[in-house]
């Protein structure tokens, strides 16, 4: 469209043919937009009740999983299998080695150290022959060295 046609259309108005084309096109655009709006609206079903699974800041009802620390008193090396399962399942474990001899204790500590390293956990001595093993989701605060007397 040239400059002279634009000026004449501006002064004289738009010819009827072009006016009706624009109106027709805008009606199609409007009907397309309403279809999109209708498609994005959820269907209403009066028999169903919908509850939000997301908790809001104002109404925070969070359900927390109960955390437990398991206590084990192994007497043989094969008892360590259950300790390892607990750590792999995200549970903290206190292991009391009072029933084991020194060689067995070293084997178990080596095994647990490797397991704790694999799950990015932590292992600390909290007493004579007593160790705390925690997986990644536990945080130990404070200094436990005062419990051991070291």
From Swiss-Prot:
Gene Ontology annotations for the cellular component aspect, listed alphabetically: cytoplasm
One Pfam family cited in the UniProt record for this chain: SepF
Claim: Cell cycle is one of the keywords in the record: yes
Compositional bias of kind Polar residues: 26-37, 48-61
Chain segments carrying region Disordered: 22-61
Listed Basic and acidic residues bias regions: 38-47
Localization of this protein: Cytoplasm
Matches recorded under InterPro entries: Cell_div_SepF (IPR023052), Cell_div_SepF/SepF-rel (IPR007561), SepF-like_sf (IPR038594)
GO terms (BP aspect): division septum assembly; FtsZ-dependent cytokinesis
Subunit structure: Homodimer. Interacts with FtsZ.
Function: Cell division protein that is part of the divisome complex and is recruited early to the Z-ring. Probably stimulates Z-ring formation, perhaps through the cross-linking of FtsZ protofilaments. Its function overlaps with FtsA.
Similarity comment: Belongs to the SepF family.
Protein name: Cell division protein SepF
High-level lineage: Bacteria, Bacillati, Bacillota, Bacilli, Lactobacillales
